[in-house]
């Protein structure tokens, strides 16, 4: 048991390091641009920051959604221990993405911010996805699970429309080459399709077991 706990801690440490590496690299490159005027972030540093943080938010969202199918396929219940961590990192990257847009792109002009959210559909769906992530991040603790009971599971089903909104945000944002958003849309479709299939299979199994036995001829 102790050896298993140590291996889980080591795995979590590795996941923390892997997930924080992109933001650490981005921070280092931003510092180079800010202090030295380098081109580490390309010709448009703000757009690059927004793109990378948004992309990692979407990737981590899909990885979080993949935890349950992976557990069901492999039988490794320990994978569930990583789901909350990855979900919170999804919210972190999404929040950095939104902050970069508000403060680096729009420079905190609130009137323009509200106009952009209302007028541009891809911003509307992206902002909506972030808003829906907020209650999931707040209620991700064991304490909230106990308080909300069954409603906790119902609330956290918001992750599915959030995934759809996030992919739609990326799809609408891309102007020409849609191969990358199409790839993420395909992954999301597989993950959601798996859940639908498992639920239908469970219902069929339950119906089969609850059906009365056939009458024996007399």
Swiss-Prot record:
Its main location: membrane. It is found in: Cell inner membrane. Binds 1 FMN per subunit. GO terms for cellular component: plasma membrane. Its cofactor is FMN; heme b. One of its GO terms (biological process) is protein repair. One of its GO terms (molecular function) is oxidoreductase activity, acting on diphenols and related substances as donors. It comes from the Bacteria. It is a multi-pass membrane protein. The chain crosses the membrane at residues 14-34, 60-80, 86-106, 121-141, 155-175. Keywords: Cell inner membrane, Cell membrane, Electron transport, Flavoprotein, FMN, Heme, Iron, Membrane, Metal-binding, Transmembrane, Transmembrane helix, Transport. Part of the MsrPQ system that repairs oxidized periplasmic proteins containing methionine sulfoxide residues (Met-O), using respiratory chain electrons. Thus protects these proteins from oxidative-stress damage caused by reactive species of oxygen and chlorine generated by the host defense mechanisms. MsrPQ is essential for the maintenance of envelope integrity under bleach stress, rescuing a wide series of structurally unrelated periplasmic proteins from methionine oxidation. HAMAP family: MsrQ (MF_01207). Heterodimer of a catalytic subunit (MsrP) and a heme-binding subunit (MsrQ). Belongs to the MsrQ family. This is Protein-methionine-sulfoxide reductase heme-binding subunit MsrQ. It comes from Xanthomonas campestris pv. campestris (strain B100).
